[in-house]
């Protein structure tokens, strides 16, 4: 049967690899979401002021997560490429430098966060109960003091996932989350001889759990039993590696900032419609429901980063393309399957989150889920393609796609449709789908162009050792020969005009000359090797 379906025969093993990596990530995200829900329920028993305090504090903490993403995205891509290259020394070096960079960033965030916590919460709480600022500031200051625990947990997990181990992060995250729930209960309510610390207890419980998780991560790295083995070496900053991590990671971090700021304007537009506050409530409920629907797409995004990065680490761009294509296709299928029940059961899902069943909230929330369910296919394209490009170290297209989709599409289109054409909240929902389509189309075109291969090579050890001294025209000629066609080196003899590049290939090997410099290229089952001839 498979012989009659060559495409399926080719991609079925890749689909299995994607699911092998993605399923533990889905479970990890579910556990994290469960902990967040339980935290809200626990704090909710203290009263509405306490809920507001924690809610505002967690909004400020999103800034920390955006900064951390600037490290995790770069670390994940470089770890994947080092693992694919079968270079344990480089994988250990990437890990040590990622941890060092994280510690430096955490120190800065701790100092800044400690001083801005109360002023920022005061600004957010304009006209609200002043007790929310007092409680929220105490909670947030403690969290900022423990920034190093939070950030190292994220980076440790991302390094393992990039290197192809998504199971250990599942166990690690699951254990930390269980401890988080236990500690929060103990310190919030103070059973027995323990003091009831209320909102402050929630911060203490979180810090203790994250601290244990950080120590456990280091033990795993040094145990010698994980895919990442920390070999003897220095943790002193290597500014070249810091640059490589941030070159890949900063655009990913800025993507989060673009989404967050655009979302604030979307909320402002929603509240300006006839639905008002009820529309904002519907949007909040819709996003909460969608956060569960997003999990498979986000997990396949992580799998795509790891698989594409590993293929490029051993310089198999043809395999990287096949893996990326398979992940994108699988993401679309899975997200479409999730969209169907969102359309059918939208009213029931909204009512589940709003037991009062307020008519405007249910109506607006139902329309949100149904309109956005139609756009889940393009959302999958955007998510997974971004992950595949990240594996190649090509993260700028994701940032540009988000700018085009969010700021140049969603914000102006939502204003026009909702307020000028008076479509109300439905106009905002349509604008969100249009923005997703724009950003998804942009990154997909970038992926299909194959230019990410150039980015991957320029960030590789092959480039640093052999090609960095060449002119741009010579580099372009060399990259073209390696990229076209991707499946095999062509059998040909060629001289590229105006570059001094001579190219001869025979049965998977090639001699490439740049004036007085010559290189021998050999493609085998493990990848591409380049050496001076």
Name every feature range the model reports, one short phrase each.
Residues 30, 34-52, 121-130, 186-197, ...:
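Helix-terminus/linker motif at the lipid-water interface of multi-pass membrane proteins
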Residues 1-22, 79-146, 194-250, 308-375, ...:
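Short alpha-helical transmembrane segments in multi-pass integral membrane proteins
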Residues 43-44, 80, 161, 169, ...:
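Helix-capping/transition residues at the boundaries of transmembrane alpha-helices
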Residues 20-36, 142, 176, 209-213, ...:
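Transmembrane helical elements of multi-pass membrane transporters/channels
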Residues 72, 76, 142-161, 169-177, ...:
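Short runs within selected transmembrane alpha-helices of multi-pass transporters and secretion channels
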Residues 26, 30, 34, 38, ...:
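Generic alpha-helical transmembrane segments of integral inner-membrane proteins
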Residues 51-111, 150-169, 280-346, 379-401:
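Small-residue-rich hydrophobic transmembrane alpha-helices
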Residues 25, 29, 40-41, 58, ...:
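Transmembrane alpha-helix boundary and packing residues in multipass membrane permease domains
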């Amino acid at each position: 049967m498979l012989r009659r379906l060559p495409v399926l025969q080719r991609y079925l093993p890749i689909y299995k690899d994607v699911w092998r990596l993605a399923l533990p990530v889905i479970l990890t995200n579910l556990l994290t979401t469960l902990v967040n829900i339980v935290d809200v329920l626990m704090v909710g028993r203290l009263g509405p002021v306490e809920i507001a305090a924690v809610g505002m504090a967690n909004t400020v903490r999103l800034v920390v997560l955006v900064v951390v993403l600037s490290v995790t995205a770069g670390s994940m891509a470089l770890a994947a490429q080092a693992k694919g290259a079968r270079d344990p020394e480089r994988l250990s070096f990437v890990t040590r430098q990622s941890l060092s960079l994280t510690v430096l960033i955490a120190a800065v965030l701790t100092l800044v966060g400690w001083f801005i916590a109360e002023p920022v919460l005061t600004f957010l709480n304009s006209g609200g109960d002043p007790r929310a600022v007092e409680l929220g500031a105490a909670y947030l200051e403690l969290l900022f003091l423990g920034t190093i625990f939070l950030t190292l947990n994220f980076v440790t997990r991302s390094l393992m996932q990039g290197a192809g181990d998504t199971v250990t992060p599942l166990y690690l995250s699951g254990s930390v989350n269980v401890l988080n729930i236990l500690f929060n209960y103990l310190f919030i309510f103070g059973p027995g001889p323990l003091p009831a610390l209320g909102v402050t207890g929630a911060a203490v419980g979180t810090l203790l759990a994250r601290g244990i998780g950080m120590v456990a991560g280091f033990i795993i790295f040094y145990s010698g039993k994980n895919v990442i083995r920390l070999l003897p070496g220095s943790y002193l900053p290597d500014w070249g590696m810091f640059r490589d991590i941030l070159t890949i990671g900063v655009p990913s971090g800025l993507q989060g900032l673009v989404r967050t700021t655009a979302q604030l304007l979307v909320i402002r537009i929603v509240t300006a419609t006839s639905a008002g506050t009820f529309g904002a409530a519907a949007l909040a409920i819709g996003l909460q429901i969608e956060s569960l629907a997003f999990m498979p797409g986000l997990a396949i995004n992580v799998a795509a980063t790891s698989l594409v990065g590993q293929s490029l680490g051993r310089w198999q761009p043809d395999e990287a393309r096949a893996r990326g294509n398979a992940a994108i296709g699988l993401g679309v299928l899975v997200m479409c399957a999730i969209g169907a029940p969102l359309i059918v059961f939208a009213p029931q899902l909204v009512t589940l989150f709003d037991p009062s069943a307020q008519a405007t909230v249910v109506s607006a929330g139902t329309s949100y889920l149904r309109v956005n369910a139609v756009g889940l296919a393009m959302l999958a394209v955007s998510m997974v393609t971004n992950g595949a490009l990240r594996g190649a170290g090509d993260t700028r297209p994701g940032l540009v796609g988000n700018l085009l989709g969010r700021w140049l599409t969603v914000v102006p289109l939502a204003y026009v449709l909702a307020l000028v054409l008076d479509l109300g909240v439905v106009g905002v929902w349509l604008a969100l789908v249009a923005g997703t389509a724009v950003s998804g189309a942009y990154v997909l075109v970038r992926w299909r162009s194959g230019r990410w291969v150039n980015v991957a090579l320029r960030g590789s050890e092959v480039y640093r050792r052999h090609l960095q001294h060449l002119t741009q025209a010579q580099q372009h000629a060399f990259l073209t020969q390696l990229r076209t066609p991707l499946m095999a080196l062509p059998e040909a003899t060629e001289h590229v005009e105006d570059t001094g590049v001579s190219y001869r290939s025979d049965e998977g090997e090639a001699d490439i000359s740049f004036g007085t410099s010559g290189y021998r290229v050999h493609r085998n089952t493990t990848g591409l090797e380049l050496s001076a001839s």
